Amino acid sequence: MASLKDLRNRIASVKATQKITKAMQMVAAAKLRRAQMAAEAARPYAERMDTVLGNLAAGIVGAGQAPVLIAGTGQSQKHLLLVCTGERGLCGAFNTSIVRLAREKAQQLIGEGKDVTFFCVGRKGYDQLRRTYPDRIIELVDLRSVRTLSFKNASDIASKILTLLDQGAFDVCTLFYSNFKSVISQIPTAQQIIPAVFEAQDEGEGGPVYEYEPAEEDILADLLPRNIAVQIFRALLENQASFYGSQMSAMDNATRNAGDMIKKQTLIYNRTRQAMITKELIEIISGAEAL
């Protein structure tokens, strides 16, 4: 049985941990609102760009003049998995769920005889993937020094991706991130960004007819590389909101668990102390009777 001193130290230790988890929960809650607003603000722009590019691509593909970012390289042997995770832990299953989805995709592709490589954004995803695929990781982007995410961060990543495409490093690129729904719901998502996949547009009778100036080919040549950066930026913002939501939930659970443990240890402490007092009283009474 633990001594009273051990129990007091244990209770004090759990209380100190509870203060830390409570503080982290409050910080995550404060940052979540700003991150959620940024993620929600980026969605309409990214979705609208997809719509515009889908309309443009429909005419170009039909004419057989589609650029490589839409038509692809003509092969699907080499796959690049762009895995975006967080730089820190203590956030529940946020990082693990994204990496799990990427691993499942990698195992499927390798089983089909495809060549798979990883482009990691975030230290936590890199640390997990290098245990299983140490020789398949070709790039790591560390964002720990970035205080506020900007479009330039995504643009720099997109430039590296496009350079790898020009070098023939891959044929298909799939982006992995966590789609923020709510504090308790973040959905791991896989999105193919090269070649781009656009949702089919419903062209009913009487629908709008678009005319583009300059030519569609010139617009696509400018917008398609930017769209890669836009989709990556959106994924980074969704990840940021998902991280804080998951961290807030995880720290709330940790704080509650610490409270339960404090109650349990306090009960054990009181029972142990009561038993020791009772034992001492019995010894005193027994000694008095012996006299």
From Swiss-Prot:
Pfam families: ATP-synt. Keywords: ATP synthesis, Cell inner membrane, Cell membrane, CF(1), Hydrogen ion transport, Ion transport, Membrane, Transport. It is a peripheral membrane protein. Its main location: membrane. It is found in: Cell inner membrane. GO terms for molecular function: ATP binding; proton-transporting ATP synthase activity, rotational mechanism. CDD domains: F1-ATPase_gamma (cd12151). One of its GO terms (cellular component) is plasma membrane. GO terms for biological process: proton motive force-driven plasma membrane ATP synthesis. Produces ATP from ADP in the presence of a proton gradient across the membrane. The gamma chain is believed to be important in regulating ATPase activity and the flow of protons through the CF(0) complex. Belongs to the ATPase gamma chain family. F-type ATPases have 2 components, CF(1) - the catalytic core - and CF(0) - the membrane proton channel. CF(1) has five subunits: alpha(3), beta(3), gamma(1), delta(1), epsilon(1). CF(0) has three main subunits: a, b and c. This is ATP synthase gamma chain. The gene is atpG.
